[in-house]
Amino acid sequence: MSDFQHAQLDWDENGQPLSRVFGDVYFSRHSGLDETRHVFLATNRLAERFAALGDGEALCIGETGFGTGLNFLCAWQLFERVAPPGARLEFVSVEKFPLAAADLRRALALWPELAPWSEPLLGQYLALHPGFQRLAFAGGRVGLTLLLGDALECLPQLDARIDAWFLDGFAPAKNPDMWSPALFAELARLSAPQATLGTFTSAGFVRRGLIEAGFAMQRVPGYGQKREMLGGTYQGPPASAGKPWYARPAPHAGRRAALVVGGGLAGCASAASLAARGWQVTLIERHPGLAREASGNPQGVLYLKLSAHGTPLSRLVLSGFGHTRRLLERLRRGHDWDACGVLQLAFDAKEAQRQAQLAAAFPADLLHGLDREQAERLAGVALPAGGLFYPEAGWVHPPALCQALATTPGITLLSGRAVRLRREGDDWCAYAGDECLARAPLAILATAADIRDFPPAAELPLKRIRGQVTRLPATAQSRALRTVVCAEGYVAPPRGDEHTLGASFDFKSEDLAPTLAEHQGNLELLREISPDLLQRLGADDLPLERLEGRAAFRCTSPDYLPLVGPLAERAAFDEAYAVLARDARQVPERACPWLPGLYLNSGHGSRGLISAPLSGELLAAWICGEPLPLPRAVGEACHPNRFLLRDLVRGQRG
């Protein structure tokens, strides 16, 4: 990923951008807006199709070449003008060389009439790094998934059904990779039946290639001085559904109502993602308020645990970080969160080697190495080593994020009641004793390891790990700390009048009462991070019994990935795919026996701030039949069925 770079631009005498790499314009020099509306909106009949959408229905547009975002903004503008209130727009666009934020602002300033749509885009145009990046607008009514990277690497990872295509790469003669048979085959794989397509080019090899891929193509009048362009409709066969145990359940039809059990980050994010799509959601929390367990710490860290090798976990973290970072813009900076950066110290030779590999694998605006002197200057305190700095990261007050998510219109909170779920007819019913508190056709379990208290999830291999944080009173001297610093533990700049220090790992204890021993252990973690900061805090002179803190249980899985997705009925699953116990290469043509309307969002470990909000979007995509906001392989790596499949192949049960 180290070759990831922003677009290199030149600007002509009219202030319009040109690609230095491809030597081509981003839009018509005469009227880019009118060209977009003719080539893409009119050719795909979007005004008619937007207007015909039903309540809760979405139209999905796919694009090759996001560029300045002009096509997206014009489509959004038209959608807002003609679509009924309950309809949604999903837009997926691939871009190898995204514009830097300053360049995007300069380009979009050419179109002041688009300001009501371009300003929200510019406000969300941050923390965009390689891979899948999810953005949301208009209260979640408009979704934008950017695939940042080479089209022939990104599109094969996409799981979507595209209703209309915008083919808008640079001219075929200047950028032939965007007009290749391999790319056309991906367009066909991703196309919904009768998907439409528009493109400015009329090149014969493009027309023939699209016909070969399954599109019925025709030349139609071009815009302005361009005599012809291409339009078409996909008439080829539908794509294979893949392995049935990871196939999508049928998109939910009928009453759009859901129960979400659990009022931490995973539950609040799941509820918010569905509510943003027009669902009525009952959020059920057994405690008197939200974020009373692992999501209740005063400060959590946006720490990116990445791999230089593109593992599913690393890709989840990279996409999840961007999504959370954009969500945080809604909160009060300095009180609810702060983008002060995170410094991971290179505390030994092995860690230094790992950091060097990461610095070579990722863009410098995501992370870069600092020597000791640079690190101390940035942190404001003396440190034992340099390290890796994440400039866009920082600390978050998790309860504030939970509260913000839970205030999404359409969410009703029921707190102070522990419930059990029972299926009655077409609904899941939440019972407290003999009283049914709420019912809905869909339910999401988001109670960390306690999802095992619900019989359908009882055998999932989740474990609890106790963690304790220590709160230290800030001093005039300790306020010099300007960034989160991590080694084996972490310490954050003060929120109000307190620093948060943590966190311990205890795999055995089931007691949530804070202990003096773990306060002492946290102080030792601080000593490793910065003896100077320890002294500034006067921590050695603080009586342990007077220290304050809290303990909670992290929930994690054997592979450290969360469990996000639909849940199958185990006995029926074992019966349907019994052949896998003898030959794991078999793919039986039997539909997965899903538990109707039951989904999970759990197992986020110590990464919940990064992974839980995007997992809410992943769940909503599974439920609503939308493009997955993550690569398909990452979605499968997080799928609850992976453990049923593993046990079946290994001949294990329970």
UniProtKB/Swiss-Prot annotation:
Its EC number is 2.1.1.61, 1.5.-.-. Keywords: Cytoplasm, FAD, Flavoprotein, Methyltransferase, Multifunctional enzyme, Oxidoreductase, S-adenosyl-L-methionine, Transferase, tRNA processing. The keyword tRNA processing applies. It catalyses: 5-aminomethyl-2-thiouridine(34) in tRNA + S-adenosyl-L-methionine = 5-methylaminomethyl-2-thiouridine(34) in tRNA + S-adenosyl-L-homocysteine + H(+). Transmembrane segments: none annotated. Gene3D superfamilies: D-Amino Acid Oxidase, subunit A, domain 2 (3.30.9.10), FAD/NAD(P)-binding domain (3.50.50.60), Vaccinia Virus protein VP39 (3.40.50.150). InterPro entries: FAD-dep_OxRdtase, FAD/NAD-bd_sf, MnmC-like_methylTransf, SAM-dependent_MTases_sf, tRNA_MAMT_biosynth_bifunc_MnmC, tRNA_MNMC2, tRNA_S-uridine_synth_MnmC_C. Its cofactor is FAD. GO terms for cellular component: cytoplasm. It is found in: Cytoplasm. Pfam families: DAO, Methyltransf_30. GO terms for molecular function: flavin adenine dinucleotide binding; oxidoreductase activity, acting on the CH-NH group of donors; tRNA (5-methylaminomethyl-2-thiouridylate)(34)-methyltransferase activity. SUPFAM superfamilies: FAD-linked reductases, C-terminal domain, FAD/NAD(P)-binding domain, S-adenosyl-L-methionine-dependent methyltransferases. GO terms for biological process: methylation; tRNA wobble uridine modification. Residues 261-654 are annotated as: FAD-dependent cmnm(5)s(2)U34 oxidoreductase. Residues 1-235 are annotated as: tRNA (mnm(5)s(2)U34)-methyltransferase. In the N-terminal section; belongs to the methyltransferase superfamily. tRNA (mnm(5)s(2)U34)-methyltransferase family. Catalyzes the last two steps in the biosynthesis of 5-methylaminomethyl-2-thiouridine (mnm(5)s(2)U) at the wobble position (U34) in tRNA. Catalyzes the FAD-dependent demodification of cmnm(5)s(2)U34 to nm(5)s(2)U34, followed by the transfer of a methyl group from S-adenosyl-L-methionine to nm(5)s(2)U34, to form mnm(5)s(2)U34. This is tRNA 5-methylaminomethyl-2-thiouridine biosynthesis bifunctional protein MnmC. It comes from Pseudomonas paraeruginosa (strain DSM 24068 / PA7) (Pseudomonas aeruginosa (strain PA7)). The gene is mnmC.
